[in-house]
Design a protein with these regions (language model features):
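Gly/Gly-Pro- and Ser/Thr-rich, intrinsically disordered tail segments characteristic of DNA damage-repair
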Residues: 1-214, 218-221
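DNA-contacting surface of Y-family translesion DNA polymerases
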Residues: 6, 180, 193-329
Length: 330
């Protein structure tokens, strides 16, 4: 039986900032873009969450909810450095590490003989070493597969471990909300609710044919996950070809100036996503896509020099967006 651990750092960016500046401890802290530039919150600590602040919220709204919020500009180089240190700790227990982002990863510790081969004890040891050596906390989920390990890591946050043993899987998934299943967003959840499904137990009662009829191939996957079955291996390499962010506006942007004003918010979200991906990812070009009111679209791109020019250059994105906007009349 496999022993999979999903490790997830608690409020990673904010925790690193509090480590660097202990005076921030106990105060509401968020990392994100400037409110004046329509920035968004990348993450916030638990003190800020008490006021309703959360990631992906506009910085302006966050400051309305919590006027005393300390908003810090992201330091991606620092976060990547801490992420490398985090992975060095993981390597003490296994080489089978699948990074999902800077602050989370899957570990297959099935062959690890440390701590009597106990996945729970290994997870607790990792948490202790991270706290003692890096000055931040992580939460861990231990289970026979990746799906359940990821669900479990969120169960005892912050700074906790939750274990789903093989013998407990059946009882655990019966009451698990279908919203916890990967790939089930609001739209899919509503479609399932119309079928009378709110929990994995409800999902188990539906015939596979019904699920395939309504959800195609994903219906088979839903059926497996509802039973707590996930055979995906921990992959030590993940190839990412691109990273992007886009937004569809309720009203068409009126002109070139409006398009350029929309860039900072998109760049803040892109920065947040970029900072979370593997430290091995290297950006080689920037691109901007603009879709017009008639549903035609155009894309402009520009390579990033090998000289080390930062991948994020606001002026470049402004210029590309403006040039793309002017193409609509051609």
């Amino acid at each position: 039986m496999r022993k999979i651990i999903h490790v997830d750092a608690d409020s990673f960016y904010a925790s690193v900032e509090m480590r660097e500046n202990p005076g921030l401890v106990g105060k509401p802290v968020a990392v994100g873009g400037s409110a004046e530039r329509r920035g968004v919150v990348a993450t916030c600590n638990y003190e800020a969450r008490k006021y309703g602040v959360h990631s992906a919220m506009s910085s302006a709204r966050a400051l309305q909810l919590c006027p005393q919020l300390i908003l810090i500009k992201a330091n991606f180089d620092l976060y990547r450095s801490v992420s490398r240190d985090l992975h060095e700790i993981f390597k003490n227990y296994t080489e089978l590490i699948e990074p999902l982002s800077l602050d989370e990863a899957y570990l297959d510790v099935s062959a690890c003989e440390l701590h009597h081969g106990s996945g729970t004890l290994i997870a607790n040891a990792i948490r202790d070493r991270v706290r003692d050596n890096l000055g931040i906390t992580v939460s861990a989920g231990v289970a026979p597969n990746k799906f359940l390990a990821k669900v479990a890591s969120d169960w005892n946050k912050p700074d906790g471990t939750f274990t789903i043993s093989p013998g407990d899987v059946a009882d655990f998934v019966v009451a698990l909300p279908v919203s916890k299943i990967m790939g089930v967003g609001r739209v899919t959840a509503k479609r399932l609710e119309r079928l009378g499904v709110k929990t994995c137990g409800d999902l188990q009662s539906l015939p596979l044919e019904t699920l395939v009829k309504h959800f195609g191939k994903y219906g088979t996957r839903l059926s497996e996950l509802a039973e707590g079955v996930d055979e995906r291996p921990v992959r030590t390499s993940r190839i990412r070809k691109s990273i992007s962010v886009e937004n569809t506006y309720p009203e068409d942007l009126a002109d070139e100036t409006a398009v350029i004003k929309a860039i900072p918010e998109l760049l803040d979200e892109l920065s947040r996503r970029f900072a979370k991906i593997s430290v091995d990812y290297v950006a080689t070009k920037r691109f901007v896509k603009v879709k017009f009111a008639d549903f035609t679209q155009t894309t402009l791109e520009e390579g990033i020099p090998a000289s080390g020019e930062p991948w994020r250059d606001d002026n470049t994105y402004d210029r590309l967006a403006a040039a793309a906007w002017r193409r609509q009349s051609r």
